[in-house]
């Protein structure tokens, strides 16, 4: 079975939830016998062609542009895949690329779509962009042979919204890594940040409005705490929001840029608490990674975060900086403990990869329109 993945920026170690998802998913599917080709976006990978843990990665050109990049690349990538890759299945990631599901079907390929979240809720999009993304969602559901959804609540909403296609919409969550659950020395904490175990709060993600980092900075400044704030991540496109956010840096508010490997694991492992104040998510991999590391979490109360089913004390109203500030101030009095082993089993990447592969294989076991 030959699968071609389109919609992600690239792998490995390209910042983003979809990219993290694919980096964990596809090597496991290759080990299970699938042939996988990822068509990456040229601005995010350094080589034209390479292999990552058995996954073939091909770079196809696109303009690096906040609004046009995804749509331009998806169109080119589907044409490229049909001519040069000849896959059995196109795997589209996110509802923007899903707009082109009819094109892939027209070219004679089966299509599966992973719905990573209601992207039209992102604050950066104007009315026209939101319309296009909602249309992409519809095209993915209508023309996809199978639709994987990473959020439980979103899965149920889509089934109600598209009852004629409900049978092909399935819940397949993101996973969490056992490797984050192991011990890692605090010696791997980045020395330039001057942080020590349990003396900082952590957040991780791209510097975009829907992540709510501006709320976190405001809440942190209000809080009565001796903890530092470490923000790991950067912006794909340097804009007014990210520039304004970065100006908040001081001796206690530390922007760590992009981190990976042992540095990132150590930052997760030794944080006092991980905070995700998002306005929009699919199923946040960074929160799962924090839980995997045994670190307590504070999460905004949006549906995808609630789907994680963390303790009640872990949640605060989205956008409510006063509530978040109060939780930071009183962090030691909150009941935040979680069943780490249970979550590792529930959000297990090996099981998720096998389930994904089984669903795709089933498309060839019967006649699928």
Give names to the regions the model predicted.
Residues 141-169, 173-180:
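A short, active-site helix/loop in glycosyltransferases that binds the activated sugar's phosphate group
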Residues 242-262:
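Nucleotide-activated donor-binding/catalytic signature segment of Leloir-type glycosyltransferases, i.e.
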Residues 20, 199-222:
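A conserved mid-protein helix/loop that constitutes part of the nucleotide-sugar donor-binding site
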Residues 313-322, 328-333:
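Conserved acidic donor-binding segment of nucleotide-sugar-dependent glycosyltransferases
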Residues 279:
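Aromatic "clamp/platform" in nucleotide-sugar-dependent glycosyltransferases that forms part
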Residues 92-97:
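Short His-centered aromatic/hydrophobic patch
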């Amino acid at each position: 079975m030959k699968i071609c993945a389109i919609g992600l920026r690239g792998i490995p170690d390209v910042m983003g939830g979809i990219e993290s998802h694919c980096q964990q998913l596809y090597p496991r599917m290759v080990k299970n016998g699938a042939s996988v080709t990822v068509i990456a976006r040229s601005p995010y990978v350094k080589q034209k062609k390479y292999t990552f843990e058995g996954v073939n990665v091909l770079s196809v050109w696109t303009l690096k542009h906040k609004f046009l990049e995804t749509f331009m690349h998806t169109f080119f990538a589907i044409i490229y895949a049909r001519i040069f890759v000849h896959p059995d299945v196109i795997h589209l990631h996110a509802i923007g690329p899903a707009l082109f599901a009819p094109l892939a079907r027209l070219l004679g390929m089966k299509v599966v779509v992973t719905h990573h979240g209601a992207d039209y809720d992102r604050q950066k999009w104007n009315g026209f962009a939101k319309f296009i993304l909602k249309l992409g969602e519809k095209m993915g559901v209508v023309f996809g042979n199978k639709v994987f959804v990473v959020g439980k609540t979103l899965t149920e909403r889509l089934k109600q919204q598209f009852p004629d296609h409900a049978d092909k919409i399935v819940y397949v969550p993101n996973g969490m890594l056992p490797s984050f659950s192991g011990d890692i020395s605090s010696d791997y904490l980045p020395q330039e940040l001057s942080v020590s175990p349990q003396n900082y709060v952590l957040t991780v993600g791209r510097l975009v409005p829907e992540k709510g980092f501006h709320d976190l900075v405001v809440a942190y400044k209000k809080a009565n705490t001796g903890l530092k704030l470490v923000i790991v991540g950067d912006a794909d496109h340097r804009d007014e929001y990210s520039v304004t956010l970065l100006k908040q840096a001081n001796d206690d508010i530390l922007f760590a840029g992009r981190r990976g490997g042992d540095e990132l694991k150590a930052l997760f492992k030794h944080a006092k608490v991980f905070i995700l104040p998002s306005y929009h998510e699919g199923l946040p991999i960074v929160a799962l990674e924090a839980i995997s590391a045994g670190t307590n979490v504070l999460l905004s109360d949006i549906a995808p975060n609630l789907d994680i089913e963390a303790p009640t004390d872990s949640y605060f109203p989205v956008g409510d900086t006063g509530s978040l500030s109060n939780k930071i101030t009183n962090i030691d009095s909150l009941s935040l403990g979680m069943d780490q082993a249970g979550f590792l089993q529930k959000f297990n990447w090996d099981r998720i990869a096998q389930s994904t592969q089984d669903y795709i294989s089933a498309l060839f076991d019967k006649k699928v329109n």
